[in-house]
């Protein structure tokens, strides 16, 4: 991997790299992530849009990732993001659930990706947050801020839920909101989240499995396209499909097809 923290970057280039770091931190943990921690720390340290306290916490977490057992990191990730929907990495699940409105929202987002010259892996959905951040890392500052502004309510809710579970992954949502000066948005969600019933209990997870079993019996392509990515991941895990790493690219590099 090339040196990602080279000097003389413009603020916009620095934020592009910061977004790629956040994308990678939110994706399924791999040995590649652990090996790249030194470079991630350098990039985080150089991001002046984040307060010093947030940079320090992110850097400490990165080092903790490097020092942890990979299987433990992966188990934590699955328990946090793939058991229940409250902390789903699928943006539109927080807005539309599994309705057809979500399907249209995904089609619209896919169109945005294609206009920018990106093609997604057929296994991935466009509202997967690490993938979305990879896309934002290729956009201008103005466009990046607009997109983050559009999802700030989702990020703030997700931040509050991750805080409630004492997860360091909350740092990523804090960092995204900090890029547009919106960290205070989280305050309104904290009391609401404290009153929520957990959706990762055995009973709640059984209900999800039953719902997904019905979805996997859908006969039409349209119905299959509306399956939650959580359901797809459950099926992939049963079939032994491996997660691919989200890539971190240097500014100016030709963007690849997006996907995991």
Q: Where on the chain are the PLM-derived regions?
A:
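Charged, alpha-helix-forming regions
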Residues: 1-128, 133-260
